[in-house]
Amino acid sequence: MITTLPTLYIKGTFNGWGLDSPLSETATGQFSTTICLSSDTHAFKITDQDGTALWTFSGHPIDTTLLVVNKETPLVNTQGIGNDLHFKPQQTGRFDVVVTFTGQHATVAVSASKENIEPTALRDHLTYQVDAVHYLPRQPPAPVHNCLASDQLFAQIEISKSSPFPFVFGDNQDGYYEGKTHTFANAGKYRHSQGWYLGTFASFIDGKINDKTKALDARLQAYGLEHRYESSADRFTLISGQRTACLSVQSHQPKALSIVPELNIAFNQSEISTFKHGIVYSLPASLCPDGAPQHIAITANKPCTFNEVSFSDHPELDSTLHLSGDNVKLFIHSLNNETQFDVYLCFAESKSAAIHLAEQAIDSDLVNLNRYSIYHFLCKNYLWTNDIEYNRAVMWARLASRTFVNHEFGAGIWAGLPWFKDCWGRDTFIALSGTSLINGQFSEAKEIITNFASMQMTDENSINYGRVPNRVTSLTNMIYNTTDGTPWMIREVMEYLNYSGDLTFAQEIYPVVKRFVEGIEKRYLDENGLMTHRDPDTWMDAKIDGQIPWSARGNRANDIQALWYASLQSAIVLAELNQDVAAKTHWASLLQQVRSNFESLFWNKETQILADRIEADGQADYSIRPNQLMTLTVPLQEPLLSPEIGSNVVSNAVSELLFPWGICSLSQSDELFHPYHDKQNQYHKDSAYHNGTIWGWNAGFTVSSLAMFGGENLAYQLSKNLGQQITDQGHIGTMSENLDAWQKNDADLVESGTFAQAWSVSEYARNAQQDYLGFKPNLLNDQLVLHPKLPTTWHEFTATLPFGCGDNLNLSFNRCGDIQHFTFQATQKESMALKLILECQTGSRIEVRGELVGTIKVEFNAQTGELKSDINNLETKIETSIHSDSVSKLKFTKPNWEIEPTSMSQPNFLKDKIENQAHQMAVD
């Protein structure tokens, strides 16, 4: 064992796998820390700051290890996934974790901490009074046209529960707050780039604590998390766009109101100072990890006193709130009896910046400014149907998608929380449409694209020439090990241009797109014009020990060809806009080659099955996976496959893979199928990751492909079920990364992976606008396209759809029998065309074109195809619908409990199979 140890940390589920719990040396070779744990199962590892192979420890290379109180457990070096140390306290309390190094061996032991001792104070306890505060409460905004008023909308989407549930908010800077209701132990932490300073908080009414464990209920609101008591309530709000949190308490009657925040600030290692309206805690730079704020300014919206206290004065801070004896214990009291008391905590890297944030918070009534900006966000892309449950789920999916937008390393979208708190190229651009574009956040979308484009590999001698990073973990650490991240970005460039009409950006981004195409032609193009790649370089990228792929999909996967095809389509449009005739002509020829050869190589005419990939030796792999659906949904212009083949693709995939709770990553009839993802003794979790496990984001293109071919009612059943996941399971208000394929209880699904995943919620939100409403703006051609695929249960709705420079299309709909009534009103000043495609029940569809000016109405008989409208310059065209009877009749499949997957009967079956084959190493 190396004698010079780095600082080691306990990283686990209780601290977001962060640097909250460093181990301190207490004796030679012995290191310990004290943590507060609730009576749940907690998973963790012992690791250095970067989780290096040499300094990452658990109890077993593959399996989980259950720790027993007061018993030493041997440690081994391992970086695996799913092989954590597990500990489940019988009751909430503080626990000492001791790691001991002896020679070449290491052990860990957990014991109940005997005392929560406060150290001898090395400075005086502060008492500071703020006698006057200039505070003007902000008034609610006027209702937005076509939308519910703010209080009505917030009340409709509020989620109330009387039992504990987890939740998460993001600050859109570099931090997020994960919490749990009805508890004080591990009840929440506001995590910055590294570490945390603010945990949970307690509110007091006339000196009596509001006990969260006994709250009547907890309410997840669009703007915060509220606990309700008999005659009062308290609320946590994380402010969007800055490092600020607001802790609030409300009382039905004027009372003395107080707040105590849980602060992870050691009393003896902090300096304290005052300013006009509050106090500032300052930490030594040596104690602040890179990117973490060093100063915390605290203020309130009413006259108040700030008192640093001890456990002897307030024992409930130890017994009920579970504060650490080492840390500051700050009471903030209102000077007068009040019905509302807001406390702001503002985090910054300089004291002056922290104070400035605090003063601004009071002057602007920041908590309500934040609240009403959320209202305007929700109204910017608005859909309100007669299905209230679906409305709520869509609103929460949109809100949840904002959790991941950040500016940690420039504008980006984190992939997932807690352990994918990085900007992944693939994930970012799959999520961009449902996070930014549908919500009218066009400048944000442009900033994210520009940021990734600036990191494009421009070294012509590199194998990654033309690629943007797959993963950005810092401004100097970028990984380019993906073949699809850049094509997804180029696809979103085209979506951005069509939503915004930004022709200037079409010129700016063209060299980036051209460089990518050149890079593919130089290194990755086969004789058929198809794009080649390594086995693990698709989204199914899990590898054994970081070397051999669990789900090999080289060297030509079907989704990669669809993305390559879409990239060429986008490049051709950009070449035309930039008057690059030679490039346009060359790429058009290549595009046609891809289209014809893709069908001949991938489509089996005899079996009517699309290959998942073509191997390097030319063999087709006909594994039934959901990827085939992307060959239909990825292209934004002319389709890659004919409608006849497309309907077969949908039928094949959905009939084999779609359960009521999501679409499997591999058919249950496949030999490699794994029915469960995590916590299995028979196999490593990564063997199941893409071999059966359900991915939330795959539901997005499943809904799109079903709606494309007339399966919108089954798609909507899936959306409804996913909506229940968002509003009632796991971390409430968001979606997890994964689910087990086989589920025994629809009402209590087994989730896995990250507790919140960007593309899961963004795809759910995207489906509402782009698929059910069928809104596809085409501003490059001065046209708005609507091709609604409305579920039959929708009888009426209102919608606001953003496009251009702050413009909206307001839409209302009602249905009476076969008669559909549409009303359109656009806000743009310039003339624009409307293209409306309406599906008839007779197998045809009517395309309506006209000038979008003022308010226009359309009446449509879906049975007869009769249409009435007051559209100017009306043109109509009748076409054959691509709706498929076979798709419209599809139903969910179910787990086949009669089969016993090989993965369950033969331990490590897939790992042994792969290691016995001659797979090429793919080390990044």
Task: Identify the residue ranges that each predicted region occupies.
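Aromatic-rich carbohydrate-binding modules that target alpha-glucans
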Residues: 2-41, 49-78
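Intrinsically disordered, low-complexity polar regions and short flexible loop motifs
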Residues: 4, 50, 61-112
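Terminal accessory carbohydrate-recognition/targeting modules of carbohydrate-active enzymes
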Residues: 109-384, 441, 711, 723, ...
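Non-catalytic carbohydrate-binding regions of carbohydrate-active enzymes
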Residues: 122-129, 578-614, 644-765, 769-805, ...
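Aromatic (Trp/Tyr) and acidic
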Residues: 142-191, 322, 551-554, 620-659, ...
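Extended glycan-interaction surfaces of carbohydrate-active proteins
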Residues: 347-351, 380-423, 447-481, 522-556, ...
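Extended, well-ordered alpha-helical scaffold segments
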Residues: 357-370, 389-396, 440-454, 503-522, ...
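Aromatic-rich carbohydrate-recognition surfaces in CAZymes
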Residues: 421-533, 557-565, 621, 693-706, ...
